[in-house]
């Protein structure tokens, strides 16, 4: 996906970027490729692939969950890695208040460099494990939305993310082709943690890759015991 195709595809979806935003995406790409030479941030470094599989893919969640486009929502991105989907969302929709969580200090430093270089406001970067931060009252049940992209299977991902979402908010799960089976396997975890699937959107990226966005509404508080201590959700998923 060329830069021009990226802009055009967003226009077709009703999202118009300013010149400044287009420049911010290009600078983000440059910073990503440069930092990737020092340590592994992503296997995707070709410009056309980054614009499709990182930038455009990240923004698809706002195409289907339009509240992200217009409201000054609080959003936490758990296991953000190189900043996806939260940084593309922040660039495209500056009114969002973003918190990014990652367990690796090198990635946190990279994210801070991007935020500083692009002069992004209302962005917080938290270094640590989701299981630990999810028990911190400063973050627990404080967010309108939580996102996670390719973080873990749904039953595990739910325990990492739903504790951050306030009652009345939603978890936005971004998955590939295996999403339906994962969701079926994760139903007990969602219910236990206070979530209910409200909608799902199946679509394809312009290159034909299958994607699914699942919206999980938070309808009751997460029991205090969740998330369990670091490592436990992955070893012993809620079932």
From Swiss-Prot:
One matching Pfam family: GidB
Mitochondrion recorded as keyword: no
EC number: 2.1.1.-
Cellular-component GO terms for this entry: cytosol
Positions annotated to bind S-adenosyl-L-methionine: 79, 84, 130-131, 149
Biased composition (Basic residues): 218-227
Keywords annotated in UniProt: Cytoplasm, Methyltransferase, rRNA processing, S-adenosyl-L-methionine, Transferase
Subcellular location: Cytoplasm
InterPro entries registered for this protein in UniProt: rRNA_ssu_MeTfrase_G (IPR003682), SAM-dependent_MTases_sf (IPR029063)
Region annotation (Disordered) ranges: 218-239
GO MF term list: rRNA (guanine-N7-)-methyltransferase activity
Enzyme class: transferase
Summary of the function given for this chain in its UniProt record: Specifically methylates the N7 position of a guanine in 16S rRNA.
Sequence similarity: Belongs to the methyltransferase superfamily. RNA methyltransferase RsmG family.
HAMAP family listed in its UniProt record: 16SrRNA_methyltr_G (MF_00074)
NCBIfam families: rsmG_gidB
Protein name: Ribosomal RNA small subunit methyltransferase G
Encoding gene (name): rsmG
């Amino acid at each position: 996906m060329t830069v021009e195709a990226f802009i055009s595809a967003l226009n077709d979806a009703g999202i118009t970027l300013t010149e400044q935003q287009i420049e911010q995406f290009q600078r983000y790409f440059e910073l990503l490729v440069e930092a990737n030479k020092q340590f592994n941030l992503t296997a995707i470094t070709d410009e056309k692939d980054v614009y499709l599989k990182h930038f455009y893919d990240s923004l698809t969640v706002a195409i289907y969950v339009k509240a992200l486009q217009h409201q000054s929502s609080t959003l936490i991105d758990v296991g953000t890695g190189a900043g996806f989907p939260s940084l593309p969302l922040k660039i495209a929709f500056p009114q969002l208040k973003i918190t990014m969580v990652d367990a690796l200090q090198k990635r946190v430093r990279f994210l801070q460099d991007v935020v500083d270089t692009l002069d992004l406001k209302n962005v917080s970067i938290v270094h640590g494990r989701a299981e630990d931060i999810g028990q911190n009252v400063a973050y627990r049940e404080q967010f309108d939305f939580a996102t996670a992209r390719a973080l873990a299977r749904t039953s595990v991902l739910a325990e990492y993310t739903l504790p951050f979402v306030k009652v009345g908010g939603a978890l936005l799960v971004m998955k590939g082709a295996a999403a339906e089976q994962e969701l079926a396997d994760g139903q007990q975890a969602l219910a236990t943690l206070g979530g209910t699937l409200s909608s799902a959107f199946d679509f394809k990226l312009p290159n034909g890759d299958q994607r699914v966005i699942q919206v999980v509404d938070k309808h009751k508080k997460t029991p205090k015991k969740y998330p369990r201590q670091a490592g436990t959700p992955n070893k012993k998923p809620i079932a």
